[in-house]
Amino acid sequence: MNQNRNRIKYSIFLFFIFFITSLYSQNKYPIILVHGFMGWGREEMGSYRYWGGKYDIEKELRDNGYEVFTANIGPLSSNWDRAIELYYQIKGGQVDYGKGHSQLFGIIQKPKGKAFKGLYPKWNKNNPVHLIGHSLGGQTIRMLDYLLKTSIQDSSNIKEKSDFLGNINNGWIKSITSISTPHNGTTLSDIVTTGIPFLQDFIALGAVMGNSYYNFDLEQWGFNRKENESIGEYYRRMQKHPGWGTKNIVSWDVSVQGDR
């Protein structure tokens, strides 16, 4: 019965995706899938996909002629950090969170482990993309849209030096679609910090499902999994990270106060 329910849910979700893409059948602009809280990329969790579970929605869309990419950004990071990572994952290059933002929250502005070749390097106003975000992914896309359209200044009121934050890049996004996104925040955001009962087991399961374990992607905080560190120790150390006490983390962004 559970298997049938999963198939029904998958069929409805896939129908929704195809419905969205059919609205833009006049163009072949790429589709970028953006995961939500505790999400993961195609190279993590073995063959179990965030977008489709045992089924592979990206592959289904590709088989139907669409150019599709799955983003893999910080599952616990703030929408600012996630939007920055999303930009560089699509365009390519060294992640730069901005001088002002990095100084404000005490994070590493350009973490060495976060440089990307680019899913779609020719991305610009002449080659825009469709963005589909699930849950927190919808908020992240809205932040990306804002940052693309705004020239950001650092704490000294000097324009940020990165091509992304320092410039205005209108027309780079063809469409935005959000699925189950808490656009006005949620009163359930404390679940993020108090812990979800199955979360540790879920992450541990991911570690044995494939060649790549689940990663919290918090290099900007100087947080990495230690050599020979167990999944349990990695998870518990993450729970105690000082970043949770700041406004540069997922728990703040999904709260009612943080989303104002």
Report the location of each language-model feature.
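Bacterial N-terminal signal peptides that target proteins for export
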Residues: 2-12
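Glutamate identity and glutamate-enriched acidic tracts
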Residues: 3, 43, 58, 67, ...
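N-terminal signal peptide c-region/cleavage motif recognized by signal peptidases
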Residues: 20-22
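N-terminal non-catalytic accessory region
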Residues: 25-132, 136-200
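Helical cap/lid subdomain of alpha/beta-hydrolase-fold lipid enzymes
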Residues: 146-147, 152-260
